[in-house]
Amino acid sequence: LSSSASSWDDWIADFKADGYSSSELVAWSYDWTQSNVTTAQQLSTKIQSVLSQTGASKVDLVVHSMGALNSRYYLKNLGGTSYVDDFVSVAGVNHGTTTASWCSWLYTSCAQMYTGSSFLTSLNSGDETPGSVSYASYWSNCDDALTPDTTAILSGATNVEVGCVSHTDMNNDHGVYEQVRNFVA
């Protein structure tokens, strides 16, 4: 899950090369300017569609950047823990970022992503990793979009610092992919 499904093309090719079929791999686009709550509701519908089409009982959910917020909202508030086996946040803004200030006045999603927002306070209250889902967060020590970069860390998750990989390269990097693949395997 990233606002543009095409951002996952490299990893989809990697998963296929490692034996996954096309029917097991779904990339989904969403409108990054809308509320994360709205996106979470749309994600819920998408996951139900995938489960119906595949006959699977659960999915592995791999997300990038803001995708962590709407996905975690889905897990925490919309019953998503019943339908997700593994959750992987790649460069996820789990605790917000000050770089969202450039758009927080214009888009609800950016205001929600800004460090200290009421959305984030609610999302991160209590258990950050609810349910029986296995959680992981992969983050870079030089990600300029995440300020501070430790905002990606989730309490209760497997948190992995991957070294210096840029924000936009995180979900294209083969080394990060290998770690994610091993986590969801």
Q: What are the language-model segments listed below?
A:
Residues 1-6, 33-37, 41, 82, ...:
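Soluble non-cytosolic domains of exported or imported proteins
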Residues 21, 83, 153-156:
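Short, structured coil segments at secondary-structure junctions
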Residues 128-185:
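C-terminal catalytic-base region of ester-bond hydrolases, centering on the histidine
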Residues 1-5, 22, 30-35, 64-69, ...:
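Solvent-exposed loop/turn segments at secondary-structure junctions
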Residues 1-59:
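Active-site catalytic motif of lipid deacylating hydrolases and related acyltransferases
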Residues 26, 60, 86-88, 134-137:
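A structural signal for isolated positions on well-ordered beta-strands in alpha/beta enzyme cores
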Residues 36-126:
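Serine-dependent carboxylesterase/thioesterase catalytic core
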